[in-house]
Regions:
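Adenine-nucleotide phosphate-binding core of ATP-dependent small-molecule kinases
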Residues: 38, 184-203
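General beta-strand structural signal in soluble alpha/beta enzymes
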Residues: 91-96, 112-114, 132-135
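N-terminal glycine/serine-rich phosphate-binding loop of ATP-dependent small-molecule kinases
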Residues: 1-100
């Protein structure tokens, strides 16, 4: 579905859905400004849909637009079907139907996660200067935008959950634990604290 020719992100209203590996963020945009937003689990797209349906009631049916960005195919597929069936909105998928407004200096065959591009575009739009963007989630990304507003790429590393799971899966005697920020002295005095300290310091 191509973006309507008269659709202007700075002047229009829309519903926005950003699907991450763990969490999904949804928002209601009015005249280019986010008026409301919520965060739900990416495992339960129907939870996000309930809020989107409520917001959509304030928008004329023939003017309903949902901006969709996703790094998780299964949830995106479910969300597309739900949006069409229950909201009747036109879906504009970022990068497929509408490019993220950020320059790129990448390999020609490179495929970059839309989440990284959106973060870079948002920071550039706010600062208009060279910057490093760190996004901590299921994965940790560290990206660079130069002084001309061009996304230069960056680095990707495991997030805290992925690091802890890797330790547990790879070493039989290491326990399965949840991440929390370690405090106190810099040395882990037991296995759990040592794991937490290692993961925390890695990031």
């Amino acid at each position: 579905v191509a973006a309507p020719l008269d659709w202007n992100p700075e002047m229009s209203s829309a519903l926005a859905v950003s699907i991450g590996n763990t969490r999904t963020q949804i928002g209601r945009i009015v005249d280019g400004t986010v008026q409301e937003y919520a965060t739900v689990s990416s495992d339960t797209p129907t939870e996000a849909l309930e809020q989107l349906v409520a917001w959509s009631k304030d928008i004329d049916k023939d003017e309903r637009i949902v901006l969709l960005a996703s790094v998780r195919a299964d949830t995106a597929d479910a969300m597309r079907s739900l949006v069409v069936d229950q909201i009747g909105a036109e879906i504009i998928e970022l990068e497929q139907d509408l490019p993220v407004p950020i320059g790129r200096a990448l390999d020609s065959e490179s495929i970059v996660g839309v989440d990284r591009l959106l973060a870079a575009a948002a920071v550039w739009n706010e600062l208009k200067q060279a910057c490093i963007i760190v996004d901590v989630g299921t994965a940790v990304t560290v990206d660079f935008v130069d002084g001309e507003g061009v996304f230069q790429g960056g680095a990707i590393m495991p997030g805290t959950r992925a690091m802890l799971d890797s330790l547990t899966d790879s070493a039989d005697l290491l326990p399965s634990i949840d991440y929390r920020r370690p405090d106190g002295e810099p040395f882990g005095r037991n296995t759990t604290e040592a794991m937490l300290r290692g993961v925390h310091n890695a990031i």
